[in-house]
Amino acid sequence: MGMGGSGRQSLTKLATFIANYELFQIEVNKTYSMENWKNDLKKVLKRAGADGKKIVFLFTDLQIKDESFLEDVSMILTTGEVPNLFAADEKAEILDRVQHTAREEGRELGETSFANLYNIFMTNVKSNLHIVLAMSPVGTRSVTLTIYKHSF
């Protein structure tokens, strides 16, 4: 939280670089849709959870085109996932990637059931994905952000 120009994004980018993490930001334009949002979420969750990449997701108040964007971010922060984001075939692909990544890193997976592999995916998301909300306390979204802030 801070006024525009106070360096929230610059400091986040610097810290991301120093920590050797990947920076992920969405690129919102006039045609950015809910489908684009869901695809971006899938991409970042797969990178963090299936590929085991350390990622900082920098999300600003100017990128909120729909209130459901905040709801999805809230779900990721509280549970590590967005319900019904992935179709069954996408989940199968994710679990294959989890197995592949674990083998490359020389980790023991133990039981390779769907539930166990999905738990590994969720654990990876929770430990590898860091979400930074760069918000301004002033402007049209301040009421929404105040309500959102108090929900935690």
Residue ranges with predicted function:
Residues 1-152:
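Conformational switch/transducer regions in large eukaryotic molecular machines and scaffolds
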